[in-house]
Amino acid sequence: MIRLVTLAALPVLVLCQFDPSKWFMGSNLGGLQGFGALPARCLKYLEPGLSRGNRPPSHRFFFNSTSGNCEQFVYYGRGGNRNNFRDVFKCMKSCGCKQQRNGGVPCNPPSQPVIRYYYDTFTKLCNTFQHTGCGGNSNHFKEWNDCFFTCGSGFEW
């Protein structure tokens, strides 16, 4: 696959699977410092909100930037912040899929690395990488279709 991409007003020819995280390492293309950063809403702390009188609380999801995962919490119905999603899929699409790939850490006892898929926000593709089996973040999937349907721009939940 060949793509012509413009970055900082410079055309870049992309052949096959292009890994921008490796290509930009150590480069001084000034406009790209925030490249791969999570949106501000994903970095906000959990705020469960305030009670709405006699209405029962509901279960929602927030992105935990420390663990790198979407986690469930009890929302009381009023207030809070934008790190508050009705379902895990919206949380993943808004935050989890925007994390850079993370191969994890070696397990104890050690195990062989396995092939997983991660969503690359630059190319908008699901690519393979080696995962050690322990740790990492939520931007890793066992199957390509899980990656694409959760994170890809071709499908909305």
Curated annotation (Swiss-Prot):
Main location: secreted
SMART domains noted in UniProt: KU (SM00131)
Subcellular location(s) per record: Secreted
Signal peptide (residue range): 1-16
Keywords linked to the UniProt accession: Disulfide bond, Protease inhibitor, Repeat, Secreted, Serine protease inhibitor, Signal
Distribution of this protein across tissues and organs: Nacreous layer of shell (at protein level).
Entries under InterPro entries matching the protein: Kunitz_BPTI, Kunitz_BPTI_sf, Prtase_inh_Kunz-CS, TFPI/VKTCI-like
Disulfide bonding pattern of the chain: 42-95, 70-91, 97-151, 107-134, 126-147
One term of GO molecular function: serine-type endopeptidase inhibitor activity
CDD domains: Kunitz-type
Domain BPTI/Kunitz inhibitor: 42-95, 97-151
Cellular component GO terms held in the UniProt record: extracellular space
Gene3D superfamilies, per database record: Pancreatic trypsin inhibitor Kunitz domain
PANTHER family (UniProt xref): BPTI_KUNITZ INHIBITOR DOMAIN-CONTAINING PROTEIN (PTHR10083:SF374), KUNITZ-TYPE PROTEASE INHIBITOR-RELATED (PTHR10083)
Protein known as: BPTI/Kunitz domain-containing protein 3
